[in-house]
């Protein structure tokens, strides 16, 4: 499968009379966009704002982040099974408004939406302080149930991303990247001396607002299966969850999965990148056993020499992570796991809720319990009053002067387990 990604570099976002991209500037017809989003069921009100890198702006509570994309050649469309019809994605050509993002906010859905600061120390912990953000402030009808509230914000964000993405349909990209995956037999014949490596992509599916969607299907209801890596770039996997914002994968991150990107970069040089296995993180033990069994079985079936396993979330999914690692290793496949830690504010507690001696190659993306003080911002987009109750906050987090003392758990993307962030380590 071959996919061309045409990146159109966006240097600024402005409101204008027509939604278009011109000389690197994304112009948005605010009234037209609000009108299109206001027809979504159960929406009470919609407004738009813009937040740029370096501005004294805080966005909270952040529900999701979406990168504007449009399918210009080939089968399928963006966000298949949800926005476009159900058809296999991941081939043809897709244009991306690189540097732009749609950020959804509104009244808090559960208690785990996050914070994005566009400047100050908090900006160093979120990748979305570097994007030009079109913020959609969406308020649902009064008295709506929580799961419907989440769905409303999710659909507003996805529709907003598709609307903005259309502005790039006829624009000549600034760069075109090509991603191509051979069949298993073609790859083995082409690279007989390279180790066969697969990527096990764990999806948050605990339920109760902790959901992920694959081609529109609630991933709680799937068994592990194989995807072409390029399918995720067209939005085959969507975030629908309100898990702690530091380590949940927003839809933007699913479309820009750095694990997939790095494995493609190594393909044909250091490794033979065979493909992606997606699996879930259900709460029942029988589901965990079934999914980890199937994941290990698929790794063996593909003849992998090595596998990288990434987690989403923490706590209960730590068990899924360790079960996957243990069983894949038992099939003779060398395994590396990528996670984050909840090791207490002093970093001295057990990092994961589960462990096994076979989990001996671990990448940590940071300790979510680390405490930070965010300075006051001149402007807040959204609702600041939820700071004390979101995950990572506590009674008194929001101070009288507008500063915030929180664990970095509250910052969107701070310890992203795919490595989509700015925390790093150096070896000496």
UniProtKB/Swiss-Prot annotation:
Molecular function GO terms recorded: glycine reductase activity
EC number: 1.21.4.2
Organism superkingdom: Bacteria
Keyword field: Oxidoreductase, Pyruvate, Schiff base
Record InterPro entries: Gly/sarc/bet_Rdtase_B_asu/bsu (IPR016585), Gly_reductase_pB_sua/b (IPR015417)
Active site: 242 (schiff-base intermediate with substrate)
Residue list for modification Pyruvic acid (Cys): 242
Catalytic function, reaction form: acetyl phosphate + [thioredoxin]-disulfide + NH4(+) + H2O = [thioredoxin]-dithiol + glycine + phosphate + H(+)
Post-translational modification: The peptide chain is cleaved into beta and alpha chains, and the alpha chain N-terminal cysteine is deaminated and oxidized to form a reactive pyruvoyl group.
UniProt KW Oxidoreductase keyword: yes
One Pfam family it belongs to: Gly_reductase
Purpose: In the first step of glycine reductase, the substrate is bound to component PB via a Schiff base intermediate. Then the PB-activated substrate is nucleophilically attacked by the selenol anion of component PA to transform it to a carboxymethylated selenoether and the respective amine. By action of component PC, acetyl phosphate is formed, leaving component PA in its oxidized state. Finally component PA becomes reduced by the thioredoxin system to start a new catalytic cycle of reductive deamination.
Subunit composition and interactions: Heterohexamer of two alpha, two beta and two gamma subunits. Component of the glycine reductase complex, together with components A and C. PB is substrate specific.
Protein name (database record): Glycine reductase complex component B subunits alpha and beta
């Amino acid at each position: 499968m071959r996919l061309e990604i045409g990146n159109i570099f966006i240097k600024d976002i402005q409101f204008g009379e027509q939604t278009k991209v011109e000389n690197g500037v994304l112009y948005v017809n605010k009234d037209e966009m609000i009108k299109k989003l206001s027809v979504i069921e159960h929406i009470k009100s919609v407004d738009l704002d813009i937040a740029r890198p370096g501005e004294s702006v805080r966005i909270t509570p952040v529900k999701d982040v979406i990168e504007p994309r449009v399918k210009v050649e080939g089968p399928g469309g963006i966000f298949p099974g949800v926005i476009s019809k159900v058809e296999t994605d991941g081939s043809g050509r897709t244009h991306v408004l690189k540097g732009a993002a749609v950020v959804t906010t509104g009244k808090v859905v559960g208690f785990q939406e996050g914070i994005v600061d566009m400047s100050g120390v908090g900006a160093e912990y979120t990748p979305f302080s570097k994007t030009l953000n079109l913020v959609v402030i969406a308020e649902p009808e009064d008295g709506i149930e929580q799961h419907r509230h989440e769905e409303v914000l999710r659909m507003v964000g996805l529709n907003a991303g598709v609307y903005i993405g259309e502005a790039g349909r006829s624009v000549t990209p600034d760069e075109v990247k090509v991603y191509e995956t051979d069949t298993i037999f073609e790859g083995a014949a082409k690279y007989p001396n390279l180790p066969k490596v697969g990527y096990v992509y764990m999806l948050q599916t605990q339920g109760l607002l902790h959901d992920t969607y694959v081609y529109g299907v609630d991933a709680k209801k799937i068994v592990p299966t194989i995807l072409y890596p390029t399918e995720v770039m067209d939005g085959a996997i969507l975030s629908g969850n309100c898990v702690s914002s530091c380590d949940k994968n927003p839809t933007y991150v699913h479309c820009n999965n750095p694990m997939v990107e790095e494995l493609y970069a190594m393909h044909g040089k250091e490794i033979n990148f065979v493909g992606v296995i997606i699996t879930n993180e259900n709460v029942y033990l029988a589901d965990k056993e079934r999914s980890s069994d199937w994941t290990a079985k698929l790794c063996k079936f593909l003849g992998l020499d090595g596998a990288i396993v990434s987690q989403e979330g923490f706590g209960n999914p730590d068990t899924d992570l360790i079960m996957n690692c243990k069983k894949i290793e038992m099939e003779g496949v060398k395994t590396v796991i990528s996670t984050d830690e909840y090791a207490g504010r002093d970093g001295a507690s057990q990092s994961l809720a589960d462990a096994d001696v076979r989990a001996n190659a671990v990448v940590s993306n940071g300790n979510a319990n680390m405490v930070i003080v965010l300075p006051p911002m001149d402007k807040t987009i959204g609702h600041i009053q939820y700071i004390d109750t979101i995950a990572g906050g506590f009674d008194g987090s929001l101070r009288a002067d507008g500063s915030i003392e929180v664990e970095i758990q509250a910052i969107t993307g701070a310890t992203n387990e795919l490595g989509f962030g700015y925390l790093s380590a150096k070896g000496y």
